[in-house]
Amino acid sequence: EGSAADAVEHLLERDRPAMSWLNLGEVHYVLARRHGDAEATEAVRDLEAVLDVRLPEADVVLAAARIKARLPMAYADAFTAATALDRDAELWTGDPELLVPGAAWRWRDLRPSG
């Protein structure tokens, strides 16, 4: 099996994965803290070109709130799950908070095995 980066690269070659602007904002602030605003802005621009990024609608916001109320996870993670449900998409992640057995959303574990 290849790395998570390889799996995501192959996904991007054949599809346009979904992401919420809320989560893309999270990507920006993490990168800005590590590498500065200019690099973070460039990375977001690059991701916007290959992802289907949308602002969350009210029903997705409320779905995220319901997920957060039921499960011990960050609100941004709840948005990730709600976006996957809204788009009927498999959530690709290595975040243990989102790898919930029996969750309403489908997920693929990108953590290295072993």
Question: What are these language model-derived features?
Answer:
Residues 52-94:
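Active-site neighborhoods of divalent-metal-dependent phosphate/nucleic-acid chemistry enzymes
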Residues 1-19, 32-45:
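Short, well-structured N-terminal submotif of metal-dependent ribonuclease cores
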Residues 34-38, 71, 107-112:
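Short, hinge-like loop/turn segments at secondary-structure boundaries
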Residues 81-114:
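Acidic, PIN/NYN-like endoribonuclease modules and their adjacent C-terminal/linker elements
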Residues 18, 54, 108:
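General small-molecule cofactor/ligand-binding pocket signal
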